[in-house]
Amino acid sequence: KFLSLFKSVIIKSVYCVNCGYCAAECKSGCIDMANGVHISNQCKHCFSCHDIYPHCLRYNSIKNRIGAKVMTGLDRYYSFGIKENWLRVYFDYEGTSSFWKSDGDGEVPNKKKDAFLNFVKDAGLVDEDKSLKGKEYKYIKYKPNKFAEKMFSLGVDDESMWAYLMCNLVYAEDSEEFRWFIKNIPFSETSTPESIKLRLDEVMENDKSGLGKRNICDALKSFLIKTPFGKQLGLGSVIDYEEKVSSNGRETITLNYFVRGSWKNPDEKVILYALYKFAEACGNYRQFTLTRLLDTSVESAGISPTQIFGLNRETM
């Protein structure tokens, strides 16, 4: 705990811009930021101002930059995200070319098909057949691999299947989207589309029109509401939204807020798979401790299953 607090003090000293978030978190009202930062002598040392993930809101918004480069691959699924039924149809076809040629029985036409292709690539379900060249092979050159065959055998209705996909999505080479979700959406706090956009501001500073941030929020909305990533796996254990269908069948969903929670029925095989992915990302270092896995403040290429699924010490 001391090391975490010590790190928090350094981070706050470097990145604080008096945004007022720490003052709002202080239950005793001991932090005053009206003119600089002043801590009252009545401070209870409850550390709630240090428990903000990861210690400072501004630091959290810029920590994913590398060499001052803005993160890329954050808008992989456009405004669509995916829907459970898209994957169901893909599984029914077992990922064959017939799925792509039929636009997934009409479920994924046009740009939706591009978004879904990015999803199956990021989820590790396909490998590229590089012998197939030309525009006509844009989709069908991506063939289901052995991992996909395992997922087909589990089926779309299996909660663990979606958990396996989430493990792959957070490590996707070409996409930062799920990795950003997992690292930046806080647990047990009310999040809104506006709060997500604020968190995205400094890693998408070139998004002057705001379209990219809107797309990401719309995609997140779809993941939360239209797939098991939301309530079942905990990315949105509580979701408040309104859904309307117009006379011509057009669906409109308004996300009011959501609260990230934990996966209530974790599968030990999935957790082992997540640990394998974690070790692989950490250079095959396998001598990690439970304390290390629970400490999400450590900067690392590996993402602990505790952070992916919100698992506590007892569950681990």
Give residue spans per PLM region.
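A broadly conserved sequence feature marking short terminus-proximal activation segments
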Residues: 1-24
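Hydrophobic, aromatic-enriched interface-forming segments
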Residues: 188-255
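Extended, charged low-complexity segments
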Residues: 55, 262-316
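A short, conserved structural fragment
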Residues: 31, 57-58, 121-134, 225-251, ...
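Short, amphipathic alpha-helical interface elements at domain boundaries
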Residues: 62-191
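Iron-sulfur cluster-binding cysteine motifs and their immediate structural context
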Residues: 21-38, 44, 48-65
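Short amphipathic alpha-helical interaction segments
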Residues: 107-122, 210-235, 302-316
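Short acidic, hydrophobic short linear motifs in intrinsically disordered regions
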Residues: 90-106, 176-217, 283-306
